[in-house]
Each structure stands twice: as C-alpha cells, then as structure tokens.
C-alpha cells in the first residue's frame, strides 16, 4: 500500500518546466519544497562536514548541482581526522561512492547507505573497517547518524538517482568547510597533510558546482578534470517510481 501511495502522490504532482526549476533559486539556496519531489530521479551529490555536523544533498539542474537541502547530523564519533582502524569508532573522511548494492532499506538503524569504506586511498594506507554508513536512529559507533526523517529523504533521492541511471553517487566527507580561514585555524593539526589533499575537491565544487573527479595516485588523493559530458540527465518525479521501503 505504501508503494502505491507514493506512486500516486508523484503522479499528482503538478508539472512544471525544468527551466522554471532552474530559475527558482541560486545554487547555494535549498530548492523550495514544492519543487523537491519533481526532481526525484535526478543525479545527486553529497557533501558531509563533521565540525558543522551537516550533510548537504545536491541535485543536478542543468549543468550544475543545486543544493536540495541541508540535514543536521545527529551524531558521529571519534572527532576530526580519517578512520584508520577497525574498532576505533571513528567516522571516515575522504572521497567515497555509493552504488545500488550499498543501499540498506531494511537496516537495523532504520535505513542506511554504505559509503564504501575502505576506498582505494584507505586500502593504500592499510586503514581497516567495514559497515560505515549514513543511517537513521541518531546512534553512531563510527557512522553518520541522521534523524529518521532526514535519512528518509536522503535515501529516497539517492535511490531515485541510482535507479534512474546514475552509475554511482559521490560522497565527499570533510572535517569542516575547507575555507582558507578554517584551514589556517587547523594548521597545526596532525592531519594537515591529509586535509590538504581533500581541499582541492572542496574548492573545485565551490568554483564549478560540479562534483570533483578524484583518483588515488601513489597513495594520495588527486583531483582531475571530469569527463566533458555526463550521460545521465535530470528527470522529473513523474517519470520515476520509488521501490517499496522494507
């Protein structure tokens, strides 16, 4: 019944032109509530900021990514810096990606998205850990815990993007908003060298409103130029059917 209700709700959403959505707000202002569901199925991008306890969810509109909404992180654990060992209860930092098999609609923590730790960088440094998630229930032992209401919306948009053809959803996790002022404030940190590898990814998105293309070379993150064209185009919610939540 829930699946049927969701489908009917989407079909009843009034149609608006995509041009109208583009003109509705700037790239740093959240999309208005009446437009949100009409963007379901469009490509998305996630940024997490530990110090600010914020998860920003972006949706592709035209050639750039627009802030869909910001969500407060209930809890994360272990303080600033990358996760290094299984059992250190530390929440990861770095560049990750999510595919469909990493979605957990029946998680013991309501709903969950496995971020894909360890990635190539983590493995190159011998970092260990598993089951690192963005999930609900506001409980964290190394994950990013959201309210159930928050993870509901995040999960729907990530699922929609992947089902509709986005190969993977990038998740960039930063210790803080990596402005020059914040970098200076943390210049004596033991993680300074690591954070300087993350900053080009943050800066690239700030300048272009497009997710950075990141690789790992000789055990270091390297931000490179993205492909000139993306095959996935934004779609409206009326073209998309949500899977039934378990």
From Swiss-Prot:
The record ties this protein, via Pfam families, to: YkuD
Active site residues of this protein: 135 (proton donor/acceptor), 143 (nucleophile)
Q: What is its EC number?
A: 2.-.-.-
InterPro entries noted in UniProt: LD_TPept_cat_dom, Transpep_catalytic_dom
- Pathway assigned to this chain's UniProt record: Cell wall biogenesis; peptidoglycan biosynthesis
**Which top EC class applies here?**
transferase
KW Nucleotidyltransferase (keyword) present: no
Tell me which Gene Ontology terms the entry assigns under biological process: cell wall organization; peptidoglycan biosynthetic process; peptidoglycan metabolic process; regulation of cell shape
Keywords noted in UniProt: Cell shape, Cell wall biogenesis/degradation, Glycosyltransferase, Hydrolase, Peptidoglycan synthesis, Signal, Transferase
Q: Spell out the CDD domains in the cross-references.
A: YkuD_like (cd16913)
Q: Does the keyword Glycosyltransferase apply?
A: yes
Molecular-function annotations in GO? carboxypeptidase activity; endopeptidase activity; glycosyltransferase activity
Residues annotated as domain L,D-TPase catalytic? 44-174
Which protein is depicted?
A: Putative L,D-transpeptidase YafK
- Gene symbol of the encoding locus: yafK
């Amino acid at each position: 019944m829930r699946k049927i209700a969701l489908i009917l709700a989407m079909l009843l959403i009034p149609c608006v032109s995509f041009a109208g959505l583009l003109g509705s707000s700037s790239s740093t202002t959240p999309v208005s509530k009446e437009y949100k569901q009409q963007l379901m199925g469009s490509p998305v991008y996630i940024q997490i900021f530990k110090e600010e306890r914020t998860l920003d969810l972006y949706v592709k509109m035209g050639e750039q990514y627009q802030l869909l909404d910001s969500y407060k992180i209930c809890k994360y654990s272990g303080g600033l810096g990358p996760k290094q060992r299984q059992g250190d209860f530390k929440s990861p930092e770095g560049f990750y990606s999510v595919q469909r098999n990493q979605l957990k609609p029946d998680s013991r923590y309501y709903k969950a998205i496995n971020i894909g730790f360890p990635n190539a960088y983590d493995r190159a440094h011998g970092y260990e850990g598993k089951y690192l998630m963005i999930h609900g229930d506001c409980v964290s032992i190394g994950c990013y815990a959201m309210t159930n209401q928050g993870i509901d919306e995040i999960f729907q948009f990530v699922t929609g993007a992947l089902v509709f053809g986005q190969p993977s959803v990038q998740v960039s996790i930063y210790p803080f908003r990596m402005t020059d002022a914040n970098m200076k404030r943390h210049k004596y940190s033991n993680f300074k060298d690591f954070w300087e590898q993350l900053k080009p990814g943050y800066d690239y998105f700030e300048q272009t409103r497009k997710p950075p293309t990141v690789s790992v070379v000789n055990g270091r993150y390297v931000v490179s130029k993205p492909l000139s064209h993306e095959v996935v185009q934004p779609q409206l919610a009326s073209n998309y059917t949500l899977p039934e939540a378990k």
